[in-house]
């Protein structure tokens, strides 16, 4: 007994040390605690919690640790305990709750009870702790306030506590919550019951019937939101935000009341900023999660907009603002930033059709207000709505731009800053149309604003706007301004370099350096004349800006030098290449001493990749220096944590952590520092593999070992995309090592790629992974997949196709929804486009398999056949039919004559669809008919005969050569050529040939153009009388066809066909008069094209 007491005493000391501010003491205590066996931990912790004479901090710590133990290690600890100990723990907990007098301590013990209850629901949903439920029912109707709070707290923490009995108890649960929410005497009971109601609704987010059953709790819930806010408690308001985010449909019966309450709270300046912003968050969240439902309440939306704008006016005077040299991060808790962000999100959520007419007048009035804060807010509001109101603003862009440019000359520097912001944002949101329409006005106005020497924040922001403008500016538009741009940028750079030396200020210089880089990047080789003006100063900055506070300037200058080098090309850059490489290498050797958040790192990594593009194979010599740090950055492992909600609340202010709510009181946290750098590093590895090819072979093994696991790096999409992109490129690099090494590498990546196709949650990333997998199969060829691979891949592709059809059905259901409107249709169209894009990637994978394996793969394909047949049914949308046909085209092209086995499924649709309304479908059908003639074997002969009149009808249709139809038409012309070439006895070639010649040349579809020119060469070389005409009278027409083909770049000089065409021309050249006659009938451009062909082929 004494020994146990002594141990318990030791444990109290340990709890004290776990709370110690001394890191060494605390670390040691954590290690000691970790080594205590689980059963002993439970005993010690319970004893400490029960001991009311122990220090309050120690008891609270013990409660937190016991909850964590049950949360993270229940299966290792609890089931191993003897059943009497388990029973004792359960009854002990309930007893302690009843005895506890301290409210905060009681909550912590309730958290333990809830955690235990969560783990005591078995797989069938049976609650293995009936006493816990009885305690809940007894306590909730107790006269003891503490016990009622305890019951509600447990239910809030674990609303699934009733397990499979929930339906049975539903009315009881409802009565319990209603009763507590009507408790007028005890505000804390009302608050807790409202939070518990929200938790219960959220825990049943897919149970629409339950929403209806609990709808009459909403008015009481909203009342609790209101009351708690005025008691300085925003917990119920936060619950309302969660409902708006996850189950907005629950709010539908009382949506107007919800919006009115949110508006009232948002506009009440007696509440603190956080509460007002949360109230606004309810409305903004609904605009994202239930836009169609919200759009019906236009008058309330119209009232919300002035509230957001009023928040944006909530700015403070700051005398040091204009010349601050450090860009402080926006104060994200400020009303101004919250209002701007809300406006941006709401415009995107509800759409410009609704928002722009409501906001336009408000903004115009603000811009005419004598108080600078209103003008600032009006301009920032214009910046914020550009993305959401894109379509509607485009129509009035001229008037907006003219108006905004006036404010670049506003008397107040912060208004000028906001005007720069608006110009920069519009340059991005409306590119490249914005640049095409307003280049003259905008460039002149920004250059003038950059001369504002007394206000460097304004100068820097004007330079930032110029960067946005030039990044998306077509090269041809920028060239006429180059002289003027360069003159301004150079004079400002010289001035700011002097200021850096004299005063140490750098803000404007950082932006100007990036502006120079952006101009060079767009101007490309046209920047050559200005190269020598900038390069010495830029090198000087990199050499001398070594102080810590100049790291960002140095990084941006390194970026600028490498972008200029890429723009002007190797020849011009070589004079400085070796100096620049030495500067980079010197920085690289200091790389290991750099702090993880050093801004130079990502600039360095990108600069190396540009140097690689400039130097090509010569870059290989630097790889030993570059690869170490690059691999180190690409291998960054982020800090992650699985926390319950209470632990997360303690961390939410912690720097750089982001949390995802996993439900059930669990949250996943990740520290985001280093993720962007990791993504950049991975993209650079892709760049090296692409540029250096076999020169990168030494690094392929370490890179593939890094990249393959990153296909599952769910913390950053860009990392997974780079990992996928790298796979086929690494195989290309490894080819030089021979087949054994290549096969080993492929085996290492193949399983992971297939699994990633099955599990990738993001459609954009998924499409990249599928594309890369298809490329890999093309590299590896026949035999690269074993039976297990085929089995798994077949299942995954089948699932993707089934999902495609299911998603289409779901979209049809959404079109029947009571809130359906044209904006909903737009978002459904976007979803549809995403699905179709994945379908194109399924087609890519099947294409690579058919082209590698030929007919051997057809038995495997049969599991997918019904789904592909379904794609080409007449009632399916045109993209389905297009891609279904493409898959059958591949089967005919690569698996014939065996493909005829499936002809019953596709021949009739293929013939029917060659005359389809959709040009994309016509093109796929025409291509199929062409390959049928080329590769299909004798069984396809009658169908070639049937196809000819259909193809001719499409070619001769009045609109056949319009932009949208021309590709389909050219595929029809090519198909006619293939039928004549490969199945000449199926059609009357003599009759068709003159027509076919009159349709040439093809110039849009380059691949089909090569096929038709090749057949034309066959006919000319065999002196076909119809082609040449009597006494060669058709030769001028043939010359014209060849010249047109050359002018439209449809003749590839490296292709054997180009040589054959050039030989035809040369033969005529030797026969004097005929040559003169042919050339005389050509335009000067056509004559030049013929000469070009002769010179190069």
From Swiss-Prot:
SMART domains named in the record: TOG (SM01349)
Name this polypeptide is given: Importin-5
Cross-referenced InterPro entries: ARM-like (IPR011989), ARM-type_fold (IPR016024), HEAT (IPR000357), Importin-beta_N (IPR001494), Importin_beta (IPR040122), Importin_rep_4 (IPR041653), Importin_rep_5 (IPR040928), Importin_rep_6 (IPR041389)
Span list, region Ran-GTP binding: 325-375
Gene that this polypeptide is encoded by: Ipo5
Oligomer status and interactors: Interacts with RPS7 and RPL5. Directly interacts with RPL23A (via BIB domain). Interacts with H2A, H2B, H3 and H4 histones. Interacts with CPEB3; this mediates CPEB3 nuclear import following neuronal stimulation which enhances the interaction in a RAN-regulated manner. Interacts with AIFM2; this interaction likely mediates the translocation of AIFM2 into the nucleus upon oxidative stress. Interacts with STX3 (isoform 3). Interacts with SRP19.
SUPFAM superfamilies membership: ARM repeat
Pfam family of the protein (one): HEAT
Family label: Belongs to the importin beta family. Importin beta-3 subfamily.
Keyword Acetylation in record: yes
């Amino acid at each position: 007994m004494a020994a146990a007491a002594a141990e318990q005493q030791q444990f109290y000391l340990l709890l004290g040390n776990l709370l110690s501010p001394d890191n060494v003491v605390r670390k040691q205590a954590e290690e000691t605690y970790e080594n205590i066996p689980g059963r002993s931990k439970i005993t010690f912790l319970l004893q400490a919690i029960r001991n009311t004479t122990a220090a309050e901090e120690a008891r609270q710590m013990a409660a937190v640790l016991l909850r964590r133990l049950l949360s993270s290690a229940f299966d290792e600890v609890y089931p191993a305990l003897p059943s009497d100990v388990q029973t004792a723990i359960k009854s002990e907990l309930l007893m302690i709750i009843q005895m506890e007098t301290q409210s905060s301590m009681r909550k912590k013990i309730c958290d333990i009870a809830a955690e235990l209850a969560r783990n005591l629901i078995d797989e069938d949903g049976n609650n293995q702790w009936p006493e816990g439920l009885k305690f809940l029912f007894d306590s909730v109707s107790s006269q003891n306030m503490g016990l009622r709070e305890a019951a509600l707290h447990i239910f809030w923490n674990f609303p699934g506590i009733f397990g499979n009995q929930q339906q049975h108890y539903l009315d009881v649960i409802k009565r319990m919550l209603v009763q507590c929410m009507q408790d007028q005497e005890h505000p804390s009971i009302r608050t807790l019951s409202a939070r518990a109601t929200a938790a219960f609704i959220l825990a049943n987010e897919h149970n629409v019937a339950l929403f209806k059953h609990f709808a009459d709790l909403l008015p009481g819930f909203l009342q609790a939101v209101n009351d708690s806010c005025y008691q300085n408690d925003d917990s119920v308001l936060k619950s309302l935000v969660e409902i708006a985010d996850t189950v907005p449909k629950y709010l539908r019966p009382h949506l107007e009341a919800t919006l009115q309450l949110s508006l009232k709270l948002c506009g009440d300046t007696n509440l603190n900023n956080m509460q007002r912003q949360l109230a606004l968050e309810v409305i903004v969240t609904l605009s994202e999660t239930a836009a169609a439902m919200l759009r019906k309440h236009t008058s309330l939306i119209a009232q919300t907009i002035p509230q957001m704008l009023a928040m944006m006016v909530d700015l403070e005077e700051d005398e040091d603002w204009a010349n601050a040299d450090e860009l402080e991060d926006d104060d994200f808790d400020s009303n101004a930033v919250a209002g701007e962000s809300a406006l941006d999100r709401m415009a995107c959520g509800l759409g410009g059709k609704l928002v722009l007419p409501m906001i336009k007048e408000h903004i115009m009035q603000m811009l005419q207000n004598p108080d600078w804060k209103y003008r600032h807010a009006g301009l920032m509001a214009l910046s914020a709505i550009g993305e959401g109101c894109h379509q509607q603003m485009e129509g009035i862009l001229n008037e907006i731009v003219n108006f905004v440019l006036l404010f670049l000359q506003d008397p107040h520097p912060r208004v000028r800053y906001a005007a720069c912001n608006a110009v920069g944002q519009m340059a991005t949101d409306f590119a490249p149309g914005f640049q095409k329409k307003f280049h003259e006005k905008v460039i002149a106005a920004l250059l003038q604003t950059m001369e504002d020497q007394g206000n460097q924040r304004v100068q820097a922001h004007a330079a930032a706007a110029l960067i946005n403008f030039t990044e998306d500016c077509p090269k041809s538009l920028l060239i006429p301004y180059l002289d003027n741009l360069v003159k301004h940028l150079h004079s400002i750079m010289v001035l700011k370099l002097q200021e850096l030396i004299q005063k140490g200020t750098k803000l404007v210089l950082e932006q100007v350096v990036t502006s120079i880089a952006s101009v060079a990047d767009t101007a490309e080789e046209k920047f050559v004349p200005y190269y020598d003006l900038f390069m010495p100063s830029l090198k000087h900055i990199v050499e001398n800006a070594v102080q810590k506070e100049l790291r960002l300037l140095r990084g941006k200058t390194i970026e600028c030098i490498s972008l200029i080098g890429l723009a002007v090309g190797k020849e011009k850059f070589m004079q400085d290449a070796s100096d620049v490489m030495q500067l980079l290498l010197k920085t690289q050797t200091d790389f290991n001493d750099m702090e993880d958040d050093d801004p130079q790192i990502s600039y360095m990594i990108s600069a190396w990749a540009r140097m690689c593009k400039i130097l090509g194979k010569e870059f290989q010599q630097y790889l030993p220096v570059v690869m170490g740090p690059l691999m180190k950055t690409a291998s960054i492992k982020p800090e992650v944590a699985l926390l319950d909600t209470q632990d997360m609340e303690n961390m939410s202010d912690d720097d750089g952590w982001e949390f995802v709510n996993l439900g059930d009181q669990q949250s996943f946290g990740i520290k985001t520092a280093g993720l962007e750098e990791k993504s950049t590093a991975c993209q650079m590895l892709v760049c090296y593999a692409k540029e250096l090819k076999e020169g990168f072979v030494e690094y392929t093994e370490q890179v593939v070992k890094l990249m393959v696991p990153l296909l599952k790096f769910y913390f950053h999409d860009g990392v997974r995309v780079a990992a996928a992109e790298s796979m086929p490129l690494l195989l290309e690099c490894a080819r030089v090592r021979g087949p054994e090494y290549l096969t080993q590498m492929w085996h290492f990546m193949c399983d992971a790629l297939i699994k990633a196709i099955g599990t990738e949650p993001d459609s954009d990333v998924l499409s990249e992974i599928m594309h890369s997998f298809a490329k890999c199969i093309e590299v590896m060829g026949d035999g690269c997949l074993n039976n297990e691979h085929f089995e798994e891949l077949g299942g995954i592709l089948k699932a993707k196709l089934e999902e495609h059809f299911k998603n289409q059905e779901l979209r049809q259901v959404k079109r029947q929804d009571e809130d359906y409107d044209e904006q909903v249709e737009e978002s459904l169209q976007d979803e549809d486009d995403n699905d179709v894009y994945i379908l194109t990637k399924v087609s890519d994978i099947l294409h690579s398999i058919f082209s590698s394996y030929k007919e051997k793969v057809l038995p495997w394909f049969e599991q997918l056949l019904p789904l592909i047949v379904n794609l080409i049914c007449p009632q399916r949308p045109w993209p389905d039919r297009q891609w279904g046909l493409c898959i059958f085209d591949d089967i005919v092209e690569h698996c014939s004559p065996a493909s005829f086995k499936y002809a019953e499924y596709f021949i009739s649709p293929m013939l029917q669809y060659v005359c389809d309304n959709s040009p994309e479908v016509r093109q796929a059908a025409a291509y199929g008919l062409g390959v049928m003639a080329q590769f299909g074997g004798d069984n396809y002969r009658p169908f070639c005969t049937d196809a000819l009149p259909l193809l001719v009808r499409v070619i001769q249709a009045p609109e056949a050569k319009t932009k949208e139809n021309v590709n389909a038409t050219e595929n029809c012309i090519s198909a006619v050529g293939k039928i004549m070439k490969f199945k000449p006895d199926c059609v009357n070639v003599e009759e068709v040939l003159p027509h076919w010649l009159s349709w040439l040349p093809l110039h849009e579809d380059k691949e089909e153009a090569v096929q038709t020119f090749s057949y034309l060469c066959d006919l000319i070389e065999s002196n076909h009388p119809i082609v040449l005409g009597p006494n060669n009278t058709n030769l001028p027409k043939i010359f014209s066809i060849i010249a047109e083909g050359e002018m439209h770049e449809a003749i590839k000089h490296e292709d054997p066909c180009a040589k054959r065409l050039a030989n035809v021309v040369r033969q005529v050249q030797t026969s004097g008069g005929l040559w003169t006659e042919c050339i005389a009938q050509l335009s000067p451009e056509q004559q030049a094209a013929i000469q070009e062909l002769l010179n190069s082929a």
